[in-house]
């Protein structure tokens, strides 16, 4: 084999090894983001670091109604995980958006439908809850005990 080809092959292998360390992104986050946009007027990024429960993880007492929406969403995902091999963060689903109405269309009782119902309920809850800017980007270690 030509030494130049070996170098190219080596470079490809090394870059693939680096890519293997990149964590996979949840597949349904795009769907959840779109549901949030359908149900309400705030951008989805407004919820990423809000309160004690919005965004990754969650602990302590929710700070307000919006934070309770996120806590309820977390618990809903926990319940969805109990049905067979259901991994909510990676499960895609079918739904329709007729602003501001959301309809989940997968078969009732399926993993996809359970996850969709969780995201739908959260998006509707987000749209109805007041937004307290003081709860965005808080220090969870001091405020969420």
Swiss-Prot record:
Catalyses which reaction(s): a 1,2-diacyl-sn-glycero-3-phosphocholine + H2O = a 1-acyl-sn-glycero-3-phosphocholine + a fatty acid + H(+)
Gene3D superfamilies reported in the protein's UniProt record: Phospholipase A2 domain
Any one GO CC term of the record: extracellular region
Chain residues that bind Ca(2+): 53, 55, 57, 74
GO molecular function: calcium ion binding; calcium-dependent phospholipase A2 activity; phospholipid binding; signaling receptor binding; toxin activity
Cofactor names: Ca(2+)
Signal peptide annotation: 1-19
Cystine pairings recorded for this chain: 38-97, 52-144, 54-70, 69-125, 76-118, 86-111, 104-116
Top EC category: hydrolase
This protein's UniProt keywords: Calcium, Disulfide bond, Hydrolase, Lipid degradation, Lipid metabolism, Metal-binding, Neurotoxin, Presynaptic neurotoxin, Secreted, Signal, Toxin
InterPro entries hit by this protein: PLipase_A2, PLipase_A2_Asp_AS, PLipase_A2_dom, PLipase_A2_dom_sf, PLipase_A2_His_AS
Gene Ontology biological process terms, A to Z: arachidonate secretion; fatty acid biosynthetic process; lipid catabolic process; phospholipid metabolic process; positive regulation of fibroblast proliferation
Cofactor note: Binds 1 Ca(2+) ion.
EC number(s) from the headed UniProt entry: 3.1.1.4
Highest taxon above the source species: Eukaryota
Tissue localization of expression: Expressed by the venom gland.
Keyword Ribosomal protein included in the entry's annotation: no
Active site (record annotation): 73, 119
Prosequence residues removed at maturation: 20-27
Subcellular location: Secreted
Function of the molecule: Snake venom phospholipase A2 (PLA2) that inhibits neuromuscular transmission by blocking acetylcholine release from the nerve termini. PLA2 catalyzes the calcium-dependent hydrolysis of the 2-acyl groups in 3-sn-phosphoglycerides.
Similarity-based family: Belongs to the phospholipase A2 family. Group I subfamily. D49 sub-subfamily.
Protein name: Basic phospholipase A2 1
